[in-house]
Amino acid sequence: MKVLVTGGMGYIGSHTCIQMIEAGMTPVILDNLYNSKSTVLERIEKVCGVKPTFIEADIRDKAALVEALKVHNIEAVIHFAGLKAVGESVEKPLEYYDNNVNGTLVLVDAMRETGVKSLVFSSSATVYGDPASVPITEDFPTSATNPYGRSKLMVEECLTDFQKANPDWSITLLRYFNPVGSHPTGELGEDPQGIPNNLMPFISQVAVGRREFLSVFGSDYPTKDGTGVRDYIHVMDLSDGHVAALEKVGSKAGLHIYNLGTGNGYSVLEMVKAFESACGKNVPYQLVERRPGDIAECWADPSKAMNELGWKASRTLEEMTGDTWRWQSNNPQGYPDA
């Protein structure tokens, strides 16, 4: 199966491309390299012996999308491309709506024009807003507490409407919880450009000496230790979830919605301690004010994905932290420049 992977040079996209190749699929990557580096391609080749086709283009460039879909005889699309920082989205809402919402509409329009009717969308647990309770099932009410989450929710609503109007399409919405970890070889990992917005790359950059200390946003949440609780999922498990979605429902007409999480919640301080165990170092941190748009706790009920896709997260907290440290210690400055 030939699959266009938008944002395939990014953190989750690159790991998913490896799992797709292992499953016998052919990923074709389209990415504008806004938050990634072209050297990712060499790492993918090093790990699995195959160098995917790479197209440098923006998802808002319809002509480039149409050409990619046609020339490569694409059968399905996995759509990762988008901006993804909660804090930045509060400062730059228009950029988030343009990239994430408008970009998706341009992509779907290009798919419609070329007759490609299978889409897997990289959504997020942020669409649940501040949930009334945990664990979270797929039928929970959706809302948003920040423009990033709202952009994901708007895309979900657009795709839901589009699938109703085009019932022969297969559209899958994968609501991720908090991806962490790296490829077990240490060849690929999370390499944010600039100051990390996510917990694990920040912790690992402190441990490797790139940053002085970790800022823990909020220590007065109604949780076990006052810090935010999240469902951290290994990026390799998440990647397997995309492959399972393509294999099980990618050619089945309908709207398919799945949580991809572990069903367990860990606090920020628990993650710091687990990382300290993995790297054998202290990770200095300071407690600071809450971030706007953050919530107290959030974890998944992943049973629907298990029942319908046969998918279950299996990698442990020790693997999440150990694999992250292997990546960061092997690549203290992240991916090299091309």
Please give the residue ranges for each predicted region.
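General structural signal for alpha-helix termini and helix-helix connectors
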Residues: 83-86, 185, 308-311
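C-terminal substrate-binding subdomain of Rossmann-fold SDR/epimerase-dehydratase oxidoreductases
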Residues: 199-338
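Pocket-edge positions in alpha/beta enzyme catalytic cores
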Residues: 57, 69, 96, 191-195, ...
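Short, flexible, glycine-rich and Lys/Arg-enriched loop motifs at helix boundaries
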Residues: 38, 167, 178-198, 209-230
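Generic, ordered loop/turn and secondary-structure boundary motif
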Residues: 128-129, 137, 143, 149, ...
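N-terminal Rossmann-like NAD(P)+-binding domain of SDR-like oxidoreductases, especially those catalyzing
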Residues: 1-182
